[in-house]
Amino acid sequence: MAQFNTVSSASDHYREESVQAATKDKETASDNTGSGKGVSENTGKSGARGDVQRQMVVERYLSVSYPLPRIKVTSPYGYRKDPFTGKRKFHGGIDLQARGDKVLAMMAGTVVKVGQDKTSGKYVTLQHGNCMISYCHLSKILVARGTAVRPRDAVGITGSTGRSTGEHLHITCRLNGKSVDPAILFEHVRRVQQECVSALAEL
């Protein structure tokens, strides 16, 4: 069951977060699961127990993923000037810059809804334990209702369908049925991957 620590809003730290760094960490994690020579030489821990520990850490690292290759927030969660009416209105999600990108599942879960409406355009909703995540304004849906997904599985392609002024990825998040700032998802991914990289360095 997915668990998160709620934050009030998306900070500047998450407005533009390159996943290249995370990818580099992933490569490091994968390298450390090979022969284990570097880790064994640095810490003196080797053998079956060390291999099992490394594998567990790598599996945890791979249990989360960012939804796009690059995270750049173009419109955060909260009140803003509505791009259509010009009036102050609550924005119940977060908008990410995108251009024909594959939208990836952030955690293991199940597709609970797919569809299209005038507001969200084409959308996919995934359930991850107590967390429901919706990806909206897609140009194409790549999964069907009831599909089990793993982290990094493509569920759609970004687009500009529905009530949209241009291509982007709109993400909404409901935690225990309550709308929350999707920035907590990026924080969750960052924290898990950072903890795993640190753990590998200590093995």
Regions found by a protein language model. Give the residues of each.
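Short aromatic-glycine-enriched beta-strand elements
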Residues: T119-T125, E167-L169
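Surface-exposed, glycine-biased beta-strand/turn segments
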Residues: A10-K122, P151, L203
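Acidic, glycine-rich catalytic/binding loops that coordinate metals and/or anionic ligands
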Residues: A144, P151, T172-L203
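Short histidine-centered loop motifs in beta-beta connectors
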Residues: L104-A105, V114, H128-R152
